[in-house]
């Protein structure tokens, strides 16, 4: 059978294995803010294990470290640094309010 007759055969592509996000020398600790901040989203949420590419044990340790840092106020619970641009303000009607019944 020649190669043109194999419709379901996928070509083999070489892939490069990604490096783990936590090296062997990195210590997972609530004081290591440079490490912890890599696993938090823009809103301040803990990213999932699938996104982080961590092992189960590493994800558990990261989660505990983030929660400890939040309790000790070295990390905010929410990151609400949203920048709103103010456009022209619309004047409100200052008359009496009417209720819709």
From Swiss-Prot:
Family listed: Belongs to the bacterial ribosomal protein bS18 family.
NCBIfam families with a match to the protein in the record: S18 (TIGR00165)
Chain segments carrying region Disordered: 1-23
Subcellular location(s) of the protein: Plastid, Chloroplast
Superkingdom of origin: Eukaryota
Main subcellular location: plastid
GO BP of this protein: translation
Organismal lineage: Eukaryota, Viridiplantae, Streptophyta, Embryophyta, Tracheophyta
GO molecular function: small ribosomal subunit rRNA binding; structural constituent of ribosome
Keyword S-adenosyl-L-methionine on entry: no
UniProt key word Amino-acid biosynthesis: no
Residue ranges, compositional bias (Basic residues): 1-19
The protein, known as: Small ribosomal subunit protein bS18c
Subunit and partners: Part of the 30S ribosomal subunit.
Keywords tagged on the record: Chloroplast, Plastid, Ribonucleoprotein, Ribosomal protein, RNA-binding, rRNA-binding
GO cellular component: a single term: mitochondrial small ribosomal subunit
Pfam families: Ribosomal_S18
